[in-house]
A protein has these predicted regions:
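Structural motif
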Residues: 26-28, 34-35, 42, 58-60, ...
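Solvent-exposed alpha-helices and their adjacent loops that cap or buttress functional pockets
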Residues: 19-22, 28, 35-37, 50-55, ...
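Catalytic-pocket segment enriched in acidic/His residues
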Residues: 4, 8-10, 91-202
């Protein structure tokens, strides 16, 4: 998911010194499977980075069956379950690339896990991001601009969703910078905690 919380739109606008511009419709973008890592693994900051690497705690929605042109009313029938994602972002590269590909898809920039839970309400998750034990963000999936069902409906109009596809549902804030030595945790109620360690590329 592109911008999906008003707080994130506003925080990123402040970073640019601009007025917030709220999207008129869901704006999907792509994340590389090669950037995925699991819990307790290392987030490797590339040598070329000069700071501005930030976490984004996100609800992750795992598709369970093939979905094409589905309605919002039955969209959640295509969900297998829910997990945790951390959409690591290098803000300078992100801002210089209209596709956001470089700033979002570096190796190890997509921590995911540790569990997938089923039979829960995706609109009622509490999402907490911690930096070295200090809470950076604390928000609810109820505050999404567009909910999970809307995203599945919209995406399935243009492309077939397949079992194992994962939708990352956006974040609320614009967090501070991470540096090597930091520990980043994303906790989502009823799912668990995704924990990763920030290191520099050797």
């Amino acid at each position: 998911a592109g911008p999906n919380y008003r707080g994130h739109v506003e925080g990123m606008a402040r970073r640019r010194g601009a007025e917030p511009q709220y999207p008129a419709r869901p704006e999907p973008n792509f994340r590389s499977v090669h950037a995925l890592i699991g819990t307790e693994e290392k987030i490797i900051v590339p040598r070329e980075c000069s700071g501005a690497v930030q976490p984004e705690g996100q609800l992750a929605v795992v598709i369970g069956k093939k979905a094409r042109n589905v309605s919002k009313d039955n969209a959640l029938d295509y969900v297998f379950g829910y997990s945790i994602g951390n959409d690591i972002s290098q803000r300078v590269w992100q801002g210089n690339d209209r596709t956001m590909f470089r700033g979002k898809n570096c190796d190890t920039f997509k921590p995911f896990g540790p569990w997938v839970v089923t039979d829960v309400d995706p609109t009622q998750f509490r999402i907490i991001v911690r930096h070295n034990g200090t809470v950076w963000e604390d928000f609810s999936s109820a505050d999404q601009i567009w909910d999970t069902a809307t995203w599945i409906q919209e995406l399935s109009r243009y492309t077939t969703l397949h079992p194992g596809d994962v939708l990352w549902m956006g974040t609320e804030g614009a967090d501070g910078d991470m540096v090597p030595g930091d520990v980043i945790e994303v906790e989502i109620s009823d799912i668990g905690t995704l924990r990763n360690y920030v290191v520099a590329e050797e």
